[in-house]
């Protein structure tokens, strides 16, 4: 089964979730987002990832095997630009480079990479053996995020610091709310990390790690994953952006949402 889901988004058509899950549809603008499943196969987040969730609620929601999840990134094509949103873990199992190749893209072809935050499963694909993987890419990272990781002890931030150093000549630090190349808007989604950022293009909202367990957190945004660095801010961002997406009829794409990797 092909692991890349292609959706061409239409600004003039309103379609049901079921239709979106099974069809591609075209627009005048031809904005396309593709799901890249970096770690193949089923993935589940266990109860220990959400320690504040009562046992009774966990069982009521039927999470016997855990909450369905994934490890993913996205390829966005819009306004003549091809943009990679996060780069996965960069481990031996990583499907990023093979999936880009299926789309006819070599690492040196990529010109734009937008990073939601500096955790290893989002920036690992930027380096191989400590060297640049995407030599011609301009890398965009929230300024608060970059500065926060620079200030952390090395035992927590060595990988992030390495990425920032190796890509320093191609690094662009933006402020939340800035419009990035391709008409992509950056949106503050702070809490999971200090400068965690979502990205919006038309009715696409890429939410990064806003949700680690969509089947739980879409209904109960007040529950955080243990990975969320600022628990209060993370819950507030999750609640705000879910509301924002619903009010504006946006489709959310997340790096840990299960297949088909998007949700209304």
What is the predicted function of each stretch?
Residues 10-17:
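Hydrophobic h-region of N-terminal signal peptides that target proteins for export
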Residues 185-198:
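Active-site glycine- and acidic-residue-rich loops that bind
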Residues 84-87, 111-121, 140-142, 188-191, ...:
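Active-site neighborhood of phospho(di)ester-bond hydrolases with catalytic His/Asp-centered motifs
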């Amino acid at each position: 089964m092909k692991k890349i889901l292609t959706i061409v988004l239409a600004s003039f058509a309103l379609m049901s979730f079921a239709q979106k899950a099974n069809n591609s549809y075209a627009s005048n603008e031809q904005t396309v987002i593709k799901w890249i499943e970096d770690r193949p196969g089923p993935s589940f987040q266990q109860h220990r990832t959400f320690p504040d969730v009562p046992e009774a609620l966990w069982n009521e929601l039927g999470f016997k095997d855990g909450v369905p999840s994934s490890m993913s990134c996205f390829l966005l094509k819009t306004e003549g630009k091809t943009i990679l949103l996060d780069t996965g873990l960069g481990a031996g199992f990583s499907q990023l480079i093979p999936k880009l190749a299926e789309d006819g893209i070599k690492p040196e072809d990529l010109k734009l990479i937008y990073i939601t935050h500096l955790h290893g499963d989002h920036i690992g694909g930027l380096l191989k053996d400590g060297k640049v993987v995407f030599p011609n890419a301009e890398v965009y990272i929230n300024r608060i995020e970059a500065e926060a990781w620079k200030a952390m002890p090395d035992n927590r931030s060595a990988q992030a610091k390495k990425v920032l150093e190796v890509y320093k000549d191609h690094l662009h630090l933006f402020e939340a709310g800035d419009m990035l190349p391709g008409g992509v808007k950056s949106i503050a989604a702070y809490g999971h990390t200090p400068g965690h950022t979502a990205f919006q293009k038309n009715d696409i909202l890429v939410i990064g790690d806003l949700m680690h367990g969509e089947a739980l957190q879409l209904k109960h945004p007040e529950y955080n994953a243990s990975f969320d660095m600022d628990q209060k801010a993370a819950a507030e961002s999750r609640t705000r952006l879910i509301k924002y997406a619903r009010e504006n009829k946006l489709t959310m794409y997340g790096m840990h949402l299960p297949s088909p990797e998007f949700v209304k």
